[in-house]
């Protein structure tokens, strides 16, 4: 799969590179986070949310809405699934990493999605991006054998456990956590996911 760069114009349909933030302390805090052989995701880390840049991200990035700052770390080379939220997500790449992304508009009426439409973008270490709400995304892929580390900023409560019953039809069947609609690939066998990704479980070599 051809790997593009988030600095390329082709990324502008999916999101944008963010400027004007000082992530020095946030990147330092990320040094204390584990990088497992698989993938781990923690929605909220108090130490990160206590940093001055957190208030800046809340006000500049989300117009004052309460936010959570967490991380996604590990080793991965495959798509496995695609999710979307009702809001943008801000990522800060601590290491070089690759995002496999698509457009929500390409999801069919039966909530299937053709994985041949997925595009790959390198996010260089130290780069912050906004990933638009209509951009399908999931866990990053590592570039270096030591794995990937990525800061994840979202509206508070996103990706936390559902506290209400959901229907098993329509878009509701994709809702696996608060503000998280997920389409899985059968090869990945993600627990609770609707396996609507059709085609290869694409990845990077």
How should these model regions be labeled?
Residues 127-129, 134-138:
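Histidine-centered metal-chelating micro-motifs
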Residues 1-125, 139-147, 151-205:
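Active-site region of the double-stranded beta-helix
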């Amino acid at each position: 799969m051809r790997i593009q760069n988030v600095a390329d114009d082709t990324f502008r349909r999916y999101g944008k590179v963010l400027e004007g933030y000082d992530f020095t302390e946030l990147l330092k805090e990320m040094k204390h986070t584990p990088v497992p052989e698989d993938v781990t995701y923690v929605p909220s880390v108090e130490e990160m949310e206590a940093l001055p840049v957190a208030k800046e991200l809340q006000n500049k990035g989300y117009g004052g809405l309460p936010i959570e700052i967490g991380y996604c770390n590990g080793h991965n080379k495959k798509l496995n699934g695609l999710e979307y939220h009702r809001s943008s997500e801000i990522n800060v790449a601590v290491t070089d990493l690759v995002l496999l992304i698509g457009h929500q508009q390409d999801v069919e009426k039966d909530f299937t999605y053709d994985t041949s439409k997925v595009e790959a973008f390198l996010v260089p270490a130290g780069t912050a991006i906004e990933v638009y709400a209509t951009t399908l995304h999931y866990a990053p892929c590592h570039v270096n054998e030591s794995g990937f580390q990525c800061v994840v900023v979202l509206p508070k409560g996103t990706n936390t456990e559902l506290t209400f019953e959901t229907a098993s039809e329509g878009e509701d069947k994709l809702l696996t956590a608060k503000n998280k609609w997920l389409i899985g690939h059968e090869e990945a066998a993600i627990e609770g996911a609707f396996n609507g990704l059709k085609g290869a479980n694409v990845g990077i070599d």
